Amino acid sequence: MAFFTCKLYSAAMAASTRVRLYYPCDLPPEVGNQVKGVFTLLHGFSNDGDDWVHFPAAIRYAADNGLVLVIPDAGNSFYNDMAWGQAWYTWLTEEMPALLRQMVRLPEEWEKNFIAGMSMGGYGALRIGLAHPERYAGVASFSGCVDLPMMMEKMGQQAARAVFGPVFGEGLQIPPQASIVRLAEQVAALTPEMQPDILCTAGLQDREPYRILEQNRKFRDAMKQIGPAKYTYLEWDGVHEWNFWDRSLVYAIDRFINPGYAAKKLGDWAAPAKEE
C-alpha cells in the first residue's frame, strides 16, 4: 500500500493545509489490480483528518475493496467558507480536487466517487455531496450534525456564538447554500439516475449533549417528505464514538461499492473465539 500526508497550498485560504492519501497499490487477487473508487472522509469538530487514520480500520476496509482514501483537514469550519475565517469549502470543492488529480491518478467517474464523514464531517459530507451530486455517487453521514439550529438551541447562545459565529457570522444565520434540507430538495428534483445514494446513521444512545439522535430522526422525517430516489437511515445501539463510525463506514462501503461486505465483516466480528 501507499500512504502519505502532504501539505498543499490553497490560494483561497492563503495557507497550506494537510491532506492524507491512501492508495491501494498491492491489492489482493480477489480485488484485482484496478482501483474501485475514491472515498473522501471528513473529520469532526475540534479534530483533524488523523482521526480517520488512527481510530477506525478505514485503511484495512479500503484495502479490502480497492479504494483510495482522501482525508483532508477542515479546521472547525463545518465545511463552509467561514464568515470570520478561511475559505474551506472553496478549498475542498475546487482547489484540492484539481491539485490531487495533478499529483496522482484518481478515478474521475461519477460512479467511483463517494464522500462520508462523522459528526461535523457528517454534515460536511451532506453539505458538499448534495451540493455536487454530479461528482458523488454516494454520500454518507455518520452521527452527523444534520440540524444546526437544533444544535445551537441546545448549546445556548454563548456557546453557539463561539462555535458557529466564525462560520456563519454574528447573526448565526445559515445561508441557503449551507442548508442540507434545501440541498436535498434540489437533489430530489433531479432525475433518479442523477441522484447520489444517501446513507445516514445515528446511535440510539447518542442523545446528549447535542441531541444527535433527535437531529437525525428529524432529518429522516424531512427526507421522507422530500423523497430523494435513494436514501437510507440506519440506527442501532451506539454513542458518539469510533466503534459506531467504524461500523457505519462498513455499511457505506457495502451500500456504495460491495454488497455483502457488511454481512462478511459482521460475521467476522460475531465469530466466537474458542479456547483450545
Model regions and ranges:
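Non-catalytic cap/lid and distal C-terminal segments of serine-dependent acyl enzymes
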Residues: 1-276
